Structures are given as C-alpha cells and as structure tokens.
Amino acid sequence: MNEAHLRICASPEWAAFVESELLPWVLREQDLGDEVLEVGPGPGLTTDVLRRQVPRLTAVEIDERLARSLAGRLAGTNVTVLHADATALPFEDGQFSAATLFTMLHHVPSAALQDRMLAELRRVLRPGGLLAGTDGVETPARRDLHADDDYLPVDPATLADRLAAAGFAGATVEVQEDRFRFAATVPA
C-alpha cells in the first residue's frame, strides 16, 4: 500500500465511514460465528470495528510493518494478528466460522493469486462457514490512488463464478455506486 493510500486508510474520516456505513452494509444479516478471520486489515480500522462484534478475531496482514503495528496496538484484546500470506494460510482446515475481506482484494496482484486466496479461505472455513467482503469498482480516481502499488480490480460481474470455482456456494454480489459487497458459504 503506497503512503497516500495508507494515510487515507488510517484517517479518522475512513474510520467513521467504516464504522457507520461500510461494515454495517457488508455484514447486514450475516452471522459471523465465534472464530473469525480478517484478511488484509492494513492499519486495522476495520479490525477495530469487527473485534467488538465477535468473540475471537484473527487478522492476517501480508505487510510486515502493518502487521507488527497492529499486533502491538491490539495486544491483550480478542484479536490475534499474524504476518502471513493469504494465498498460503498457516491454519488448519475448517478452523474459522467466517472470513472477511474489506477493500483488499484489489491489492492481490494477479487473478491467479486472488483465486488461490479464495480457495485458501474456502479451505480454512468450516462447513457452513461464511465469506463476506467488499471492494471498490474500478474508477480513474482509484487507479490514481494506487499508483506505484499493486492494483488489480475485481470485476463484480465475474466474482460469483470465481467464488463457485473456489468451492463456495450461494454466492451473492451486490453493486452499490462505486463499490460492491459479496457473500458466499462453504457447503455444509
């Protein structure tokens, strides 16, 4: 994540948006269960909201500096932070009741790696487990914000098929203006 993007994702304005609009929209009518995995929390503003809603939360961040900072800030809470690559998760099969991806999928640098990550999430979710997330629709402003950064926008029109190919069932994708939310489950 480049520095300009990181400043936005760590800002009080983004924190307010995440808490009042983004997470309530993505998680509306979703049961996350008792053991939740968050992939790509960045500076952790989504983690701050999510940890108040679930008993146990594990956050996986590929950026070592961000993972270390978040782990230090959330030490002693119900959150475990790991520096790890979500395309090769260090967890047992079926360990989590739910997994979340909040505005991070576009940072995975290739469609093949995005699909590998989705398959890994399928692997670590229990039967009946939920995958829920959101990402932005590609716009010139978003492309500019990601200058000198990994940026591979996901086409919401193809995401349900990609989730099915990864082993998920019942995928839904809803576009709202410049963003979309998605959800799918692991077959029981």
Briefly describe each language-model feature range.
Residues 37, 42-88:
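Class I SAM-dependent methyltransferase SAM/SAH-binding core
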Residues 115-127:
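A short glycine-rich, Lys/Arg-flanked "PGG" loop and its adjoining helix->strand segment in the class I
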Residues 1-6:
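N-terminal, positively charged/glycine-rich alpha-helical extensions of SAM-dependent methyltransferases
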Residues 14-34:
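Conserved alpha-helix/loop element of class I SAM-dependent methyltransferases that forms part
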Residues 103-107:
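Short catalytic micro-motifs in class I SAM-dependent methyltransferases
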Residues 100:
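A conserved beta-strand element that flanks and buttresses the S-adenosyl-L-methionine
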